[in-house]
Amino acid sequence: MAIEKSIASSSIAEVIDRVLDKGVVIDAFVRVALVGIELIAIEARVVIASVETWLKYAEAIGLTAQPSAA
């Protein structure tokens, strides 16, 4: 079975569709210090996904509110 490489370029719409379908998480921590004195610290978590994708994975790890049984 031969491996085929695709040399066709992706359009921006295809890239955005794939990112929204699969999701991307960026976790960053930046600290700026001068002579051992911390001047600024920035912590950021960025999630890029469609609402459907986020809800699917958020429910799997328990981040969504569970409906109460009435």
UniProtKB/Swiss-Prot annotation:
One of the record's GO molecular function terms: structural molecule activity
PROSITE patterns with a match to the protein in the record: GAS_VESICLE_A_1, GAS_VESICLE_A_2
Subcellular location: Gas vesicle shell
Predominant cellular place of this UniProt entry's protein: other
Transit peptide found in the keyword field: no
Keyword Cell cycle attributed: no
Keywords of this entry: Gas vesicle
GO CC annotation terms, alphabetical: gas vesicle shell; vesicle membrane
InterPro entries: Gas-vesicle_GvpA-like, Gas_vesicle_GvpA, GvpA, GvpA-like_CS
Physiological role: Gas vesicles are hollow, gas filled proteinaceous nanostructures found in some microorganisms. During planktonic growth they allow positioning of the organism at a favorable depth for light or nutrient acquisition. GvpA forms the protein shell.
Family membership noted in the UniProt record: Belongs to the gas vesicle GvpA family.
Subunit and interaction comment: The gas vesicle shell is 2 nm thick and consists of a single layer of this protein. It forms helical ribs nearly perpendicular to the long axis of the vesicle.
Listed name of the protein: Gas vesicle protein A
UniProt source species: Bradyrhizobium sp. (strain ORS 278)
